[in-house]
Amino acid sequence: MGLSRYVPASLRPRAHQASRTLRRAAGAVPRSPAQGRASAERVLDRRIVPDEQRRALLLRAFEARARLATGSARDQASITRQALGLGRRLTRLGHPAAAVRVYTAGEAALREPSQRLLLTVQRTALELRRGEVPADLWERLADLLALADRHLDAGDTDTAGTRLQEAYNLAFHRTLHFEDRMSPLAADPDAFLAPLRASAAHRAVETLTPRERPTATSGAGRPHRLLVTTFMNWNFLGGILDDYRATPGVEVRTLDLQQIPDGPWRAQPVDLVKDRLRQTRSGPPLEPPAEVREAFDWADTVFVEWGHRALSWVSMLPEVSARVVVRVHSYEAFTPMPLHTDWAGVDDVVFVSPHIRALVEAAVPGIHAVRRHTIVNRNLLDTFARPKLPGAEHVLGLIGWNNVTKDPAWALDVLEALHRHDDRYRLRLLGNEFDRTNVTGASAAYRATLMRRIEAFGPAVERPGFTDDVPEALRGIGVILSTSRREGTHEGLAQGAASGALPVVRNWPYVARWGGPASLYPQSWVVETPDAAAARILDLAGSGRLGSASSDAAEWVRTQYDWSVVRPRLDEVLLGPR
């Protein structure tokens, strides 16, 4: 491995033993350098890294190598390569703590700030993924932003964009905003965004780009042309597309930006930031393939679903005469995409809830240049009005529970509070099991604790799994819970209320400051604690008012949020002139 001459004398016997193990495991003498490297890598993956003692020796050898590093450019570059390679290998093989040690040792050895930051980005991202907030996170974020500013000042928008995106990756990491802690953006946008706003590169991408948009062509005598575009996620669009395709006088096309040919127009996050910086420096415009350009030229209205990649991408397109309407749900508000969108290229933005709108308005300066609307998602709520099954009044329901944001542990707290008074109550968790893949350390720890609690409740907690027939499943549920830490609208809550289940809604803590569920639903539905949730249920059941309260909630939600009520408002935005 080229490290033996850097190993301290006290460790050399063990290092030689490890070297012999490598040679024995490698077998035949390699016939080429490439074959030799491949053989050594197999031994590392199969014999060295999985073994605790050998892995510890490997780490100590690298740390010794890093401590004895010289300041020569060649030696510094070697340290960087070795740290990146070894750190990624350890991460891939399931040893993130060891990878953090490697990156930390490499950072201490490197003299050149930009080279050291290559390891810093890997180390801090890995710590965040493990569910830990690095003690030096904000200092390193400032380093990345300062480097982005220097490259931008030198006219290197590509490198500036790379460094700026790395800063966004850290500042908006899911551990900070979507896992087991309050999002610092939602808690205090000004304080959270202050380091970004101090950066010239970030201020550049937030600045609206002056432009003259061409006059829209007349649609007289032909159908209104609606182009619907997104990046991969069509979850909330299926019914809407069907409805508009069936509407006389409307012609619909769709465009998934993930499916367009690869090229300089890619909608990858780092490319979007680079393109945005080039745009602010009067660089060449973002020009898509001819067939994509034709679709935008064809359209009278472009409906961009999700305020994420597609939003930033479409906002930079030149010469768009169509009306550009974007819809923002909840997730996107906690990403950097709305911040580096060129809002000069957008006409209208639709928010699915007032509290998400309030948060984005506080965080994103450019949004104030755009007409803003609040229109909830499509829901055919009349289909949920079905008779309840016997015993449903003692069944609590939670629709969708397989992530930390839904916080199903809070539902267990409610059940526990109810059982202190009446052990007939059960909790039914509808939907897929708690996710095991692509989770952070915090999410994995949450799941482990949750599953232990569920097992302890025995038959009082039911997990029937995913169902395609939610209206039928709701017949057996008499109380619909919303236990989330953050929501946009919570479709399952609206559907449950429409079915005649009593709605009991936690005051979603991550967005409570911005209005929370009370910005969408009656205040009487909202509670602060599990004990208050249990008290609402027991009080209405004990007084004989459970049935009437549930009926009133069903009537209210259907008259407010059924698609028959909501669609005319969306029609006005999508089908009107620019």
Predicted regions: what is each one?
Residues 336, 345-371, 379-381:
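A short, active-site helix/loop in glycosyltransferases that binds the activated sugar's phosphate group
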